[in-house]
Amino acid sequence: MSAGAPVAPRAASPQLALTRAPRRGLLVALLAALLATGSLVAAPAPASAAGIKVAIVVGPAGSLTSSYLRSARGYAAQARSYGATVAEVYTPNATWARVRAAVQGANLLIYLGHGNGFPNPYNATLTPLKVDGFGLNGSLSSGNVRTTYFGEYYVRTQVKLAPNAVVILNHLCYSTGSSEPGNPTPTPTVARQRVDNFTAGFLRTGAQAVFATLGEASYLIDSLFTSDQALLDIFWNAPDRTWAYRISFPSARTPGMTAVMDPKAPGTYHRSVVGNLSMTAATWRS
Protein backbone atom coordinates (compact mmCIF):
# COMPACT_ATOMS: atom_id res chain seq x y z
CA MET A 1 0.00 0.00 0.00
CA SER A 2 1.43 3.35 -0.99
CA ALA A 3 1.93 6.14 1.53
CA GLY A 4 -0.98 8.53 1.63
CA ALA A 5 -3.50 6.04 0.26
CA PRO A 6 -6.77 6.17 2.19
CA VAL A 7 -7.34 3.32 4.63
CA ALA A 8 -10.84 1.88 4.76
CA PRO A 9 -12.24 1.46 8.29
CA ARG A 10 -12.05 -2.10 9.51
CA ALA A 11 -15.38 -3.76 10.07
CA ALA A 12 -15.99 -5.09 13.55
CA SER A 13 -15.58 -8.79 13.88
CA PRO A 14 -18.96 -10.53 13.98
CA GLN A 15 -17.61 -12.79 16.74
CA LEU A 16 -16.50 -9.74 18.85
CA ALA A 17 -19.87 -8.02 18.46
CA LEU A 18 -21.67 -11.17 19.47
CA THR A 19 -19.38 -11.58 22.53
CA ARG A 20 -19.86 -8.02 23.87
CA ALA A 21 -23.64 -8.06 23.82
CA PRO A 22 -24.09 -11.14 26.04
CA ARG A 23 -21.50 -9.80 28.53
CA ARG A 24 -23.29 -6.45 28.80
CA GLY A 25 -26.59 -8.23 29.32
CA LEU A 26 -25.02 -10.48 31.96
CA LEU A 27 -23.73 -7.48 33.93
CA VAL A 28 -27.13 -5.80 33.86
CA ALA A 29 -28.83 -8.99 35.02
CA LEU A 30 -26.28 -9.47 37.84
CA LEU A 31 -26.72 -5.89 39.07
CA ALA A 32 -30.50 -6.29 39.10
CA ALA A 33 -30.20 -9.51 41.09
CA LEU A 34 -27.93 -7.90 43.70
CA LEU A 35 -30.29 -4.98 44.17
CA ALA A 36 -33.28 -7.30 44.45
CA THR A 37 -31.65 -9.45 47.15
CA GLY A 38 -30.20 -6.54 49.11
CA SER A 39 -26.65 -7.79 48.54
CA LEU A 40 -25.65 -4.39 47.18
CA VAL A 41 -26.38 -1.82 49.90
CA ALA A 42 -25.33 1.81 50.02
CA ALA A 43 -23.12 2.94 52.93
CA PRO A 44 -25.21 4.11 55.90
CA ALA A 45 -25.76 7.83 56.20
CA PRO A 46 -24.21 9.58 59.23
CA ALA A 47 -26.43 9.47 62.31
CA SER A 48 -28.59 12.53 62.79
CA ALA A 49 -27.74 14.70 65.79
CA ALA A 50 -30.97 16.68 65.61
CA GLY A 51 -32.25 17.26 69.12
CA ILE A 52 -28.92 16.50 70.81
CA LYS A 53 -27.71 19.20 73.20
CA VAL A 54 -24.05 19.67 74.03
CA ALA A 55 -22.99 21.96 76.88
CA ILE A 56 -19.36 23.08 77.12
CA VAL A 57 -17.98 24.84 80.19
CA VAL A 58 -14.53 26.37 80.65
CA GLY A 59 -13.49 27.59 84.08
CA PRO A 60 -10.60 29.91 84.96
CA ALA A 61 -7.27 28.10 84.67
CA GLY A 62 -4.60 30.78 84.85
CA SER A 63 -1.94 30.42 82.16
CA LEU A 64 -3.75 27.40 80.71
CA THR A 65 -6.99 29.28 80.11
CA SER A 66 -6.28 30.25 76.49
CA SER A 67 -5.38 26.66 75.61
CA TYR A 68 -8.56 25.33 77.22
CA LEU A 69 -10.69 27.94 75.45
CA ARG A 70 -9.14 26.95 72.14
CA SER A 71 -9.91 23.28 72.77
CA ALA A 72 -13.47 24.07 73.87
CA ARG A 73 -14.21 26.09 70.74
CA GLY A 74 -12.87 23.22 68.66
CA TYR A 75 -15.17 20.78 70.46
CA ALA A 76 -18.11 23.14 69.92
CA ALA A 77 -17.42 23.37 66.19
CA GLN A 78 -17.07 19.58 66.02
CA ALA A 79 -20.43 19.02 67.74
CA ARG A 80 -22.17 21.57 65.51
CA SER A 81 -20.74 19.86 62.43
CA TYR A 82 -22.82 16.80 63.39
CA GLY A 83 -25.96 18.92 63.76
CA ALA A 84 -26.04 19.26 67.55
CA THR A 85 -27.14 22.34 69.47
CA VAL A 86 -24.27 23.69 71.57
CA ALA A 87 -24.41 25.86 74.69
CA GLU A 88 -21.10 27.45 75.67
CA VAL A 89 -20.22 29.12 78.99
CA TYR A 90 -16.64 30.31 79.23
CA THR A 91 -14.49 32.13 81.76
CA PRO A 92 -14.44 35.00 82.78
CA ASN A 93 -18.23 34.74 82.79
CA ALA A 94 -18.63 31.11 83.86
CA THR A 95 -20.48 31.70 87.11
CA TRP A 96 -22.42 28.91 88.78
CA ALA A 97 -25.74 30.53 87.91
CA ARG A 98 -24.86 30.67 84.21
CA VAL A 99 -23.35 27.20 84.11
CA ARG A 100 -26.27 25.65 85.96
CA ALA A 101 -28.74 27.16 83.50
CA ALA A 102 -26.73 26.15 80.42
CA VAL A 103 -26.14 22.50 81.27
CA GLN A 104 -29.71 21.50 82.15
CA GLY A 105 -30.96 18.77 79.82
CA ALA A 106 -27.64 18.33 78.04
CA ASN A 107 -26.94 15.01 76.37
CA LEU A 108 -23.21 15.70 76.48
CA LEU A 109 -21.51 17.88 79.09
CA ILE A 110 -17.86 18.83 78.60
CA TYR A 111 -15.96 20.67 81.33
CA LEU A 112 -12.43 22.04 81.03
CA GLY A 113 -10.69 23.77 83.92
CA HIS A 114 -9.17 23.18 87.33
CA GLY A 115 -10.13 20.10 89.28
CA ASN A 116 -10.38 19.81 93.05
CA GLY A 117 -10.81 16.22 94.15
CA PHE A 118 -10.54 13.90 97.11
CA PRO A 119 -8.38 12.45 98.61
CA ASN A 120 -6.17 15.55 98.53
CA PRO A 121 -3.34 16.97 100.69
CA TYR A 122 -5.56 19.64 102.23
CA ASN A 123 -8.54 17.88 103.79
CA ALA A 124 -8.87 14.79 105.95
CA THR A 125 -12.48 14.21 104.89
CA LEU A 126 -14.45 14.70 101.70
CA THR A 127 -16.13 18.13 101.53
CA PRO A 128 -18.97 17.86 98.99
CA LEU A 129 -19.45 21.62 98.72
CA LYS A 130 -15.91 22.13 97.40
CA VAL A 131 -14.61 18.97 95.72
CA ASP A 132 -15.48 16.76 92.73
CA GLY A 133 -17.41 19.34 90.73
CA PHE A 134 -16.69 22.54 88.80
CA GLY A 135 -14.04 25.25 89.26
CA LEU A 136 -15.75 28.46 88.08
CA ASN A 137 -15.79 32.24 88.28
CA GLY A 138 -17.05 33.55 91.59
CA SER A 139 -18.62 36.54 89.86
CA LEU A 140 -18.99 37.92 86.35
CA SER A 141 -15.71 39.06 84.83
CA SER A 142 -13.76 37.89 87.88
CA GLY A 143 -10.80 37.00 85.72
CA ASN A 144 -9.07 33.83 84.63
CA VAL A 145 -6.96 33.16 87.71
CA ARG A 146 -9.15 32.99 90.81
CA THR A 147 -11.25 29.83 90.98
CA THR A 148 -14.36 29.24 93.06
CA TYR A 149 -15.26 25.58 93.47
CA PHE A 150 -18.78 24.23 93.27
CA GLY A 151 -18.46 20.64 94.35
CA GLU A 152 -20.35 17.38 94.14
CA TYR A 153 -23.22 18.71 96.26
CA TYR A 154 -24.07 21.42 93.72
CA VAL A 155 -23.79 18.98 90.81
CA ARG A 156 -26.03 16.25 92.21
CA THR A 157 -28.64 18.56 93.70
CA GLN A 158 -28.93 21.29 91.05
CA VAL A 159 -28.07 19.70 87.69
CA LYS A 160 -30.40 17.47 85.68
CA LEU A 161 -28.92 16.14 82.45
CA ALA A 162 -30.77 14.25 79.73
CA PRO A 163 -31.40 10.52 80.23
CA ASN A 164 -28.32 8.50 79.19
CA ALA A 165 -26.17 11.63 79.13
CA VAL A 166 -22.38 11.44 78.95
CA VAL A 167 -19.93 13.73 80.75
CA ILE A 168 -16.36 14.50 79.65
CA LEU A 169 -13.94 15.99 82.19
CA ASN A 170 -10.98 17.39 80.27
CA HIS A 171 -7.62 18.40 81.79
CA LEU A 172 -8.83 18.29 85.41
CA CYS A 173 -6.43 17.35 88.18
CA TYR A 174 -7.74 14.48 90.34
CA SER A 175 -10.43 13.43 87.82
CA THR A 176 -8.24 10.71 86.28
CA GLY A 177 -6.65 9.80 89.61
CA SER A 178 -3.74 12.18 89.09
CA SER A 179 -2.25 14.64 91.56
CA GLU A 180 -1.69 18.35 91.09
CA PRO A 181 1.61 19.25 89.37
CA GLY A 182 4.46 19.04 91.86
CA ASN A 183 2.59 16.87 94.34
CA PRO A 184 3.55 13.26 95.09
CA THR A 185 2.35 10.45 92.84
CA PRO A 186 -0.75 8.87 94.38
CA THR A 187 -0.90 5.23 95.34
CA PRO A 188 -3.19 3.05 93.21
CA THR A 189 -5.71 3.02 96.07
CA VAL A 190 -5.81 6.82 96.29
CA ALA A 191 -6.02 7.14 92.49
CA ARG A 192 -9.01 4.79 92.39
CA GLN A 193 -10.74 6.75 95.15
CA ARG A 194 -10.21 10.02 93.27
CA VAL A 195 -11.74 8.64 90.09
CA ASP A 196 -14.68 7.13 91.94
CA ASN A 197 -15.35 10.29 93.96
CA PHE A 198 -15.06 12.74 91.06
CA THR A 199 -17.68 10.92 89.03
CA ALA A 200 -20.20 10.30 91.82
CA GLY A 201 -22.03 13.63 91.64
CA PHE A 202 -22.23 13.64 87.85
CA LEU A 203 -23.63 10.10 87.81
CA ARG A 204 -26.53 11.35 89.92
CA THR A 205 -27.59 13.89 87.29
CA GLY A 206 -28.95 11.36 84.79
CA ALA A 207 -25.57 10.68 83.21
CA GLN A 208 -24.67 7.09 82.40
CA ALA A 209 -20.93 7.62 82.07
CA VAL A 210 -18.17 10.07 82.95
CA PHE A 211 -15.00 10.08 80.86
CA ALA A 212 -11.92 11.89 82.18
CA THR A 213 -8.80 12.60 80.15
CA LEU A 214 -5.78 14.86 80.43
CA GLY A 215 -5.40 14.75 76.64
CA GLU A 216 -7.61 15.63 73.68
CA ALA A 217 -11.25 14.57 73.86
CA SER A 218 -12.24 14.96 70.21
CA TYR A 219 -12.15 11.20 69.60
CA LEU A 220 -14.82 10.74 72.28
CA ILE A 221 -17.09 13.29 70.63
CA ASP A 222 -16.59 11.75 67.20
CA SER A 223 -17.33 8.22 68.44
CA LEU A 224 -20.48 9.29 70.27
CA PHE A 225 -21.89 10.99 67.19
CA THR A 226 -20.76 8.59 64.46
CA SER A 227 -20.40 5.07 65.88
CA ASP A 228 -22.59 2.42 67.47
CA GLN A 229 -19.83 1.22 69.81
CA ALA A 230 -20.25 0.46 73.49
CA LEU A 231 -18.77 3.13 75.74
CA LEU A 232 -16.07 0.75 76.94
CA ASP A 233 -15.00 0.13 73.33
CA ILE A 234 -14.93 3.88 72.70
CA PHE A 235 -12.64 4.25 75.73
CA TRP A 236 -10.24 1.58 74.49
CA ASN A 237 -10.18 2.95 70.95
CA ALA A 238 -8.52 6.15 72.17
CA PRO A 239 -5.49 7.17 70.10
CA ASP A 240 -3.45 7.55 73.33
CA ARG A 241 -4.50 4.28 74.96
CA THR A 242 -1.88 2.27 76.83
CA TRP A 243 -3.77 -0.82 78.08
CA ALA A 244 -0.71 -2.44 79.69
CA TYR A 245 -1.39 -0.99 83.16
CA ARG A 246 -5.18 -1.00 83.05
CA ILE A 247 -7.23 -1.01 86.24
CA SER A 248 -10.89 -2.00 86.53
CA PHE A 249 -13.10 -2.05 89.61
CA PRO A 250 -16.77 -1.78 90.63
CA SER A 251 -17.66 1.72 91.77
CA ALA A 252 -18.08 2.03 95.53
CA ARG A 253 -19.66 5.50 95.31
CA THR A 254 -22.11 4.60 92.54
CA PRO A 255 -23.21 0.96 92.93
CA GLY A 256 -23.82 -0.83 89.65
CA MET A 257 -21.32 1.29 87.74
CA THR A 258 -17.89 0.12 86.58
CA ALA A 259 -14.66 2.12 86.67
CA VAL A 260 -11.78 1.63 84.23
CA MET A 261 -8.43 3.43 84.33
CA ASP A 262 -5.67 3.42 81.72
CA PRO A 263 -2.40 4.70 83.25
CA LYS A 264 0.40 5.64 80.85
CA ALA A 265 2.80 4.01 83.30
CA PRO A 266 2.58 2.88 86.91
CA GLY A 267 1.51 5.96 88.87
CA THR A 268 0.83 8.08 85.76
CA TYR A 269 -2.94 8.38 85.66
CA HIS A 270 -4.21 10.18 82.57
CA ARG A 271 -7.48 8.48 81.43
CA SER A 272 -10.50 6.96 83.12
CA VAL A 273 -14.18 6.23 82.67
CA VAL A 274 -16.90 5.30 85.15
CA GLY A 275 -20.44 4.30 84.31
CA ASN A 276 -22.68 1.89 82.47
CA LEU A 277 -20.00 0.93 79.99
CA SER A 278 -22.14 -1.49 78.00
CA MET A 279 -24.37 1.38 76.84
CA THR A 280 -23.81 2.16 73.16
CA ALA A 281 -23.36 5.44 71.34
CA ALA A 282 -26.55 4.62 69.44
CA THR A 283 -28.44 4.50 72.74
CA TRP A 284 -26.88 7.82 73.74
CA ARG A 285 -28.14 9.40 70.50
CA SER A 286 -31.65 7.94 70.79
What are these regions (language model features)?
Residues 3, 95, 141, 146, ...:
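Short, solvent-exposed coil/turn linker segments
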Residues 3-47:
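Secretory targeting and sorting signals
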Residues 46-50, 158-160:
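Short boundary motifs at domain starts and secondary-structure transition points
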Residues 175-286:
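Active-site-proximal C-terminal subdomain of hydrolase catalytic domains
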